[in-house]
Structure formats: structure tokens, C-alpha cells
Amino acid sequence: MRIALAQIASPLDEPPEHRRERVAGMLLDAPDSDLVLLPELWAPGYFAFDDYADRGESVADGPTVTAMARVARERSQWIHVGSVLEKVGGGRLRNTAVLIGPDGGTRLTYSKMHVFGYRSKEAELLEPGTTIDATDTPFGRLATTTCYDLRFPGLWQTISDLGAEVALVPAAWPEARVAHWRLLTSARAVEHQLLVVACNAAGSQGETRIGGHSRIVDPWGEVLLELGSDEEIAACSVPDDVVAATRAEFPVLDDRLPAYDHRTDES
């Protein structure tokens, strides 16, 4: 299988409708791949907090999903939209990831469960999601998490329990903590023997420089592809059996206990 990372810049002075058109053109002109992943909230701009209320959309037929579904159909390609500001009623918004199949239909959605509060308004403006799921694809059983979710092992244990073999991670991870990004994407791949496909944003949004370094990490922790810090689309080939072969050769997950109880010494 061939997987592409679309490391997109979202400058705050670029209108979302222009960015959607620009990115759709980039994807249509990109080399062939079976699956492409975009960053977190690339269309509205993650750091465009003052505009969130005006940039919410439907995950069924909103402008971002509609534009990416058209690309998916034209290229017969799976597209992970990254995430959009989903309107969920009553003026509420969620940070929702969307996976689109080659027929343009939605195959999986996930609303980010760990909204970020440190020097960010995400936790003030967005409602956290409450559920996560996985779906079967030609690439294996697939789940998605978003950005800050990387820091929470319990969520990753859950997607492992759901049978995930591939984890897609859209992000808007700042350059200041890009070392953590690289460490955590590798760690999650190794500890759960997953193929981790992680797409960060690029460029600057206001005063914040985004870290880039989108990457694909196999279950051994080998980095199959890593981008730099600028906007680009790049792809690599990944063996179809990389997860199954790793788990068969080194069956760590077979030794995982069903529970790890905390014991208190009462003596």
C-alpha cells in the first residue's frame, strides 16, 4: 500500500474557502497513493479561535468533507480529512476527524476526546468527544486519534483493544514540542505494534509556529517516512503485512494482562 501525508500550512490570513480549493488542487496533482492523511483543522485553521463559531460545518455535507469526497472519487482514493469543526447543535462544536472511502462515502468519524487547554482556547470553545471506534479497510483495521490524544496511553490501549492495526493521527502540534511529537508517535507504534500514520500541520498560525515532521512509523519503531517543517505532500510504500508480520515474529501483545490492579499496602 502507498500512503501519503499532506502537510498543509494554514496561515490565518488565507480564507478557508481559498484553502479548501488550493488543497484540493494539490491533492489532485499529487502522485498516486492509496490513502492520504491531512492535518487537524487545516481548513478553518487550528489557531483561528476567534473565527471558530463562523467556521463550523456538518460532517455529512459541509464544504470541507464535500471537497475532499470529490477528490476521493476522482482519484479512487481513501482520504482522511484530518478534522473539521463539527456543528453538533445548540451552538456547540467538536473537533471531528473524518475518513472518506474511494466512493466518497464517510467510513469513520471520531471527535477528539482530549481537548487541549494549555495556552489554547480549544478546551473553552470545543466539546470533547465521548466515544472511539475502529473500522475495517483494505489497509487493515483502522482507528484514528487526534493530536493531544497522543499523550494519553489509556485511549491508545482502547484502540488496541478494538483490534486496530493502523492508527491515523492528524495534528496541529507546535514546533516548541516537536521532540515530544516524534517520541510519542514512535512509542505508540512500538507499544501497541501498530502502523502509526501521523500528519502534522506546517507553517505559522499567528504567533505559533507549527512543527511539521509528519511521519509514518512501523510497529518496530522504524520511521518509514518523515517530512521536514515546510508545506509538502510526500508518500511512501508500506508492506501490506507489516503489522501481522511484526506481531507474529515478536508477539508482545499476547503477554498483555487483562487488568493491572492497584494494590494498597494496609499493614
Model region roles, listed by residue range:
Residues 1-5:
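Extreme N-terminal starter segment of soluble prokaryotic enzymes
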Residues 13-103, 109, 174-194:
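Cys-nucleophile CN-hydrolase/nitrilase-fold catalytic domain and related Cys-dependent amidase chemistry
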Residues 49, 98, 109-116, 215, ...:
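Short beta->alpha transition motifs characteristic of CBS
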Residues 60-78, 150-234:
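CN hydrolase (nitrilase-like) catalytic-core segments centered on the catalytic cysteine
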Residues 81-83, 96-99, 133, 214-216, ...:
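Short beta-strand scaffold segments in enzyme catalytic cores
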Residues 88-162, 175-177, 183, 245-252:
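Active-site catalytic loop in hydrolytic enzyme cores
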Residues 244-267:
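A short C-terminal boundary segment appended to hydrolase-like catalytic domains
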